[in-house]
Every structure is written in C-alpha cells, then in structure tokens.
Amino acid sequence: MSVQTSSNRPLPQANLHIATETPEADSRIRSAPRPGQDPYPTRLSEPLDLPWLNRREPVVKGEEADGPLSAAQLDTFERQGFIFEPDFLKGEELEALRHELNALLARDDFRGRDFAITEPQGNEIRSLFAVHYLSRVFSRLANDERLMGRARQILGGEPYVHQSRINYKPGFEGKGFNWHSDFETWHAEDGMPAMHAVSASIVLTDNHTFNGPLMLVPGSHRVFVPCLGETPEDHHRQSLKTQEFGVPSRQALRELIDRHGIEAPTGAAGGLLLFDCNTLHGSNANMSPDPRSNAFFVYNRRDNRCVEPYAASKRRPRFLAHEPDEAWSPDG
C-alpha cells in the first residue's frame, strides 16, 4: 500500500467532537439532533455549531469466525475505515473482467443512456451503473461469496447490492472527484437510514500514484460531516459528473486531514479495496498516459433498506439505488 499524508509530522490521535445539545432551548441551530430526529442532518441552509457529529453505529458488526477476514483485518477496518487486499483476483479471472469492461464501455447503445455517465467535457463513458444487471460476468462477481462473505462479516447481517458500477478514467483526460462521504449522499438522496453499508472496489488496471487512484482519509468514518446547500432537483444528473452539493466544508476537511492524513492504496491490477460507507474519499485527475478502471459494488444490510430520502424531494433513479431482490432492467 502506498501511503501519502498531508505532512511528514506524526499524526495525533483524533479527539472527536462530541455532539451535545446547545443550552438554549430556542437555539437557532442545534449542535446535535434531538431524539427522534434525523441523526445525520445534512444539505443544511446554515451550518451546525460543530463541524461534525459522532457516528452512532458500530463500524464492524461481525467477528473473525463470521467470515474470511482475519481479526487483524477487521481491526484495521475498524480503525481506518478501509482495508486493501492485493492480488484478490488474478490470471484468467482478471483478464475476463477486463475484457468484459472494455466490451461494455464500447457499447454504442449505452451511450446517452441515464445509467452511462460520460466525462464532464466529452463523450467518453466514465461510469456504467447497474453493471450487475447489464452483464452476467459482473453479476457473478457481485454475488460471489468471496465478496458477499466479507460484506456479511463487516455488516453483521445479510447484504444485498445497493449499487454497482464500473469506472474508467482515461489517460491524460480522466477527471478527479471531490472529497465526499458516500453515506452522506445515500442518506440524503436515497434514504439509507444508517451506516450499515460497505463498498468493494476491485482495481482492473494497475493503480499507481499518477493515474488518479482513490484517496481516503483514515479514521474519518467515525464522524459524520453535515454539508451545506439544499439538494437541487435531479441532482444526480450533475453530481455524477462533478459533485458540488454534498461536499464537506474545507474547514472540516482540513481538520480531519490534519489529524489523520491521506492514504492512497496502489498496486497491481486485481487488488480489492473494502471501505466503510462513511469514509471520506476522492481522487485526482489522471495525469499519466495509463488508464485506470475498477469494478465497484456497494453492499447494504437488508434491514437497512432505503426509505424516503432525508434531504431530497424524491429518491434517485433505481439504477443508482437498488432494492433488495428487485429486477432492474435498462429498458424499464
């Protein structure tokens, strides 16, 4: 794992902000939700008194005996909010996935569809969503017990695929993505109630420092950073290209990165990155000639299925947020 931090000095242990109610009963803005209110308020018109709120759910709900991850791996996930496993896939299995990815990205009938996201200034497909419904190859991978078992172990319950996609960042042209917490979006716009989801990203090309690898803030999963700005109508049409709403403040980012640093897992194709739904992450532009691609699956716990969105007028389309056991089709 290649590690990049914001400075070379030792990083102190975070002293998390404690979310407490303000003493004034009629306070204009509260520091924490009252009992019965949304525990993770976001897309606010005005900031809270604190830059973040404590996470309420445990990070790891299962134990070593519950799945393939070792006690050391579970401890790392608990502490950092992610783990990286090199050589999770290799050989013919990896080659078959690369071949399928290239075939899907070349589909002209996908171009212009709502589930196919192109570069902000171009026509090249950047992401294909609901890929486990578009491809039998990726459907088998999404439901592979090697992934499902890890998700079940971390979540402490039966998972289902909340979202799937393949991402492609072309050489010299692939744009970056702002810092964000996936849970903030899924809570605000999909109606995911609690932090019982985990993401699995399998790198299908070599990941190195210069081709825009995913960067994460270790330890950031332990707090929730409310974001400012009311969710625009059909926000997903813009946010999947360039996200402007649901982005933490620079103050909060500066404090969290100063305390925890930044890590960017790199390595050969076939590695698996598992990260908590609330871990802050982002990526730089691809400044190298080498493309970067990955397969991405989000596993949500079945008893945490989505309800009405907490900070949007309506839920996002189903290709972005699946229901358990649903049968989605690109043809509706």
UniProtKB/Swiss-Prot annotation:
Positions with a binding annotation for 2-oxoglutarate: 169
UniProt-annotated binding residues for Fe cation: 180, 182, 281
Positions bearing the site annotation: Important for ectoine stabilization: 186
Cofactor: Fe(2+)
Pfam families referenced in this protein's UniProt entry, alphabetically: PhyH
Biased composition (Polar residues): 1-10
Binding annotation for L-ectoine: 163
Keywords on record: Dioxygenase, Iron, Metal-binding, Oxidoreductase
Region (Disordered): 1-47
Free-text comment on the cofactor: Binds 1 Fe(2+) ion.
Variation of activity with pH: Optimum pH is 8.
GO MF annotation: an example: iron ion binding
EC assignment: 1.14.11.55
Temperature dependence: Optimum temperature is 32 degrees Celsius. Active from 5 to 47 degrees Celsius.
InterPro entries to which the protein is assigned, alphabetical: EctD, Phytyl_CoA_dOase-like
Reactions accelerated catalytically: L-ectoine + 2-oxoglutarate + O2 = 5-hydroxyectoine + succinate + CO2
Family: Belongs to the PhyH family. EctD subfamily.
Self-association state and partner proteins as the record states: Homodimer.
PANTHER family: ECTOINE DIOXYGENASE, PHYTANOYL-COA DIOXYGENASE DOMAIN CONTAINING 1
Function: Involved in the biosynthesis of 5-hydroxyectoine, called compatible solute, which helps organisms to survive extreme osmotic stress by acting as a highly soluble organic osmolyte. Catalyzes the 2-oxoglutarate-dependent selective hydroxylation of L-ectoine to yield (4S,5S)-5-hydroxyectoine.
Protein name: Ectoine dioxygenase
Species: Halomonas elongata (strain ATCC 33173 / DSM 2581 / NBRC 15536 / NCIMB 2198 / 1H9)
